[in-house]
């Protein structure tokens, strides 16, 4: 059976069909319901909200009092010789009450949903590409350091430390080369007087040792009065 839907408006439609086999009953069963929850819920008669009986001599019917901008699920059944009941189904969409519907412009809700999903996916892709571009720009502008001939210079030549500038380890070695002097401590007066005498004796011993090495003059010890 070939079912055709024509003259669809926001509250009605005309359904016509051409039977391929004769109907054994006296009438056709025209069943339809709004398809709000599911596209297909079975061919059982109690699933349909509306049912009309049309004599088998009539091959078209006008449906009225339909909801605007609603998808309808329609089936036509008739008892035949081969099967107890044969169901032939189709779907149609009523028009909207807006002025665009009067001019013949109809937008499928499923198409609108796909368009909305495509727009959201494009926005997400654009944001992700922008974040990746910003990260790549930051990586490109990072300073790249290179060490050449004892000096550290930036790859683009903006910052440079010449060779004459001593490094940190060299400065520590220079500081280690300086002699260390012991700071005077606060001692008693007797120890302060003994220090010049000890220095004088040390000087005398150095003079004697120097004279022995030369060998030209006899060693003469200096005499200090007590």
Curated annotation (Swiss-Prot):
The chain crosses the membrane at residues 113-133. InterPro entries: FN3_dom, FN3_sf, Ig-like_fold. Keywords: Membrane, Transmembrane, Transmembrane helix. It is found in: Membrane. It comes from the Eukaryota. GO terms for cellular component: membrane. Its main location: membrane. The keyword Membrane applies. Residues 1-101 form the Fibronectin type-III domain. It is a single-pass membrane protein. The keyword Transport does not apply. Gene3D superfamilies: Immunoglobulins. This is Fibronectin type III domain-containing protein 9. The lineage of its organism: Eukaryota, Metazoa, Chordata, Craniata, Vertebrata. The gene is Fndc9.
């Amino acid at each position: 059976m070939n079912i055709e839907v024509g003259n669809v408006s926001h509250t009605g439609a005309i359904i016509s069909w051409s039977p391929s086999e004769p109907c054994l009953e006296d009438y056709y069963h025209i069943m339809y319901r709004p398809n709000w929850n599911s596209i297909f819920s079975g061919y059982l008669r109690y699933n349909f909200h509306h049912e009309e009986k049309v004599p088998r001599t009539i091959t078209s019917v006008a449906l009225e009092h339909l909801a605007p901008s609603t998808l309808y699920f329609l089936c036509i059944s008739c008892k035949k010789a081969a099967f107890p009941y044969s169901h032939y189904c189709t779907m149609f969409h009523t028009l909207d009450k807006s002025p665009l519907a009067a001019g013949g412009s109809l937008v499928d809700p499923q198409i609108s949903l796909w368009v909305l999903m495509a727009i959201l996916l494009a926005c997400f892709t654009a944001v992700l590409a922008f974040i990746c571009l910003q990260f790549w720009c930051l990586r490109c502008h990072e300073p790249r350091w290179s060490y050449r001939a004892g000096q550290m210079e930036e790859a683009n030549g903006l910052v440079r430390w010449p060779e004459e500038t001593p490094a940190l380890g060299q400065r520590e070695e220079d500081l280690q080369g300086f002699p260390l002097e012991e700071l005077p401590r606060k001692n008693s007066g007797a120890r302060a007087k003994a220090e010049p005498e000890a220095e004088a004796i040390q000087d005398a011993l150095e003079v004697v040792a120097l004279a022995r090495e030369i060998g030209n003059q006899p060693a003469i010890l200096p005499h200090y009065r007590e």
